[in-house]
Amino acid sequence: MAAGTLYTYPENWRAFKALIAAQYSGAQVRVLSAPPHFHFGQTNRTPEFLRKFPAGKVPAFEGDDGFCVFESNAIAYYVSNEELRGSTPEAAAQVVQWVSFADSDIVPPASTWVFPTLGIMHHNKQATENAKEEVRRILGLLDAHLKTRTFLVGERVTLADITVVCTLLWLYKQVLEPSFRQAFPNTNRWFLTCINQPQFRAVLGEVKLCEKMAQFDAKKFAESQPKKDTPRKEKGSREEKQKPQAERKEEKKAAAPAPEEEMDECEQALAAEPKAKDPFAHLPKSTFVLDEFKRKYSNEDTLSVALPYFWEHFDKDGWSLWYSEYRFPEELTQTFMSCNLITGMFQRLDKLRKNAFASVILFGTNNSSSISGVWVFRGQELAFPLSPDWQVDYESYTWRKLDPGSEEAQTLVREYFSWEGAFQHVGKAFNQGKIFK
């Protein structure tokens, strides 16, 4: 049975995974989370700590036998028993599946939505709305899976349940008000069942579900930012007095989103939004206002209002149209997994939204599907090479530039933007679509 010390900071949801697992397995885990024994941001940067845990990340676990391991999922696995890990190869694979799903699909939108409400990340309206839709998709996926199941894998709690519950915890506490979560009764039932297990309660205490969706508080965010030392100024002109204030505003925009004591390094990376050079700054101004088209598209009828507006105002010199197809349709199996490919790409392209719009569609059924889309980009070239952050997915697609004046472009834009039409070039029925805006 594992025994050792867990280094973390207080109320770290990532550490909860290992602590709940230990409650089930009987592993003896001591927690060091506060001075003088452990000071996050200091202790974890000392040479002694880094010799044991080179990444300097928490949570980190040191066994009484000297064994050291970091990364919360690895620690939770180590302190678990066979029942939690999955007692058969199939069950173990499904546990890993849900643990991976929590990290790849739940953490990004949950962080984007929740962090601003806690004052540790600046609010971006479009990003938040996108995150809400992604959370809604995730809860729906879980709801369908749990319709005939008590737990995610098998008939007992496993690491799958522990991990996904902990990943959803702040969503349920901060933003999933009754009107939002009521559409997912099976997910809610499962979540409540888990958090009311004695082993969960021993770590989480009584979890109070959100009654009213928390909102971004600009004042709280400003107060949470690290205070910078500024040189003292002698009294001078009005411009000299105003300059430090302007500089402080810029520092707030570019600053890391929270003090080190509030987040681990992974969360700091998710929340940080450094001020960067605009990759499109070299392009001349355009008469086409993409945001206005997006408003038309979101709020008006696509065929009768949004598309006529698009073609009337589209600047073919300042913008370009592209058709894309996924290169490896033979690898597409379950349609929900194929949709995850699209959603994951959109998430990684989040900072491209101001200069792009797309409708990407999944056609076909399980084990016989394809993905293709129509994109609008600022400039005359593909935007992806302009930033390393945008280059993860695009090579998995073929790209063909469209002539805005051609009949083909008119047809593709109409069909893909409206999700209606024959789609004769595809040869498969429309399944579902995703909009990048």
From Swiss-Prot:
Residues bearing PTM N6-acetyllysine: 147, 212, 401, 434
A Pfam family per the record: GST_N
Alphabetical keyword list: Acetylation, Elongation factor, Isopeptide bond, Protein biosynthesis, Ubl conjugation
Cross-link (Glycyl lysine isopeptide (Lys-Gly) (interchain with G-Cter in SUMO1)): 253
PROSITE patterns tied to this protein: EF1G_C (PS50040), GST_CTER (PS50405), GST_NTER (PS50404)
Region (Disordered): 221-268
Record-listed cross-link Glycyl lysine isopeptide (Lys-Gly) (interchain with G-Cter in SUMO2), residues: 285
InterPro entries associated with the record: EF-GSTs, EF1B_G_C, EF1B_G_C_sf, Glutathione-S-Trfase_C-like, Glutathione-S-Trfase_C_sf, Glutathione_S-Trfase, Glutathione_S-Trfase_N, GST_C
Domain GST N-terminal positions: 2-87
CDD domains linked to this entry: GST_C_EF1Bgamma_like, GST_N_EF1Bgamma
A single MF term (Gene Ontology): translation elongation factor activity
EF-1-gamma C-terminal domain mapped to chain residues: 276-437
Residue numbers of N-acetylalanine PTMs: 2
GO cellular component: cytoplasm; nucleus
Known role: Probably plays a role in anchoring the complex to other cellular components.
Subunit structure: EF-1 is composed of four subunits: alpha, beta, delta, and gamma.
Entry protein name: Elongation factor 1-gamma
Originating species: Equus caballus
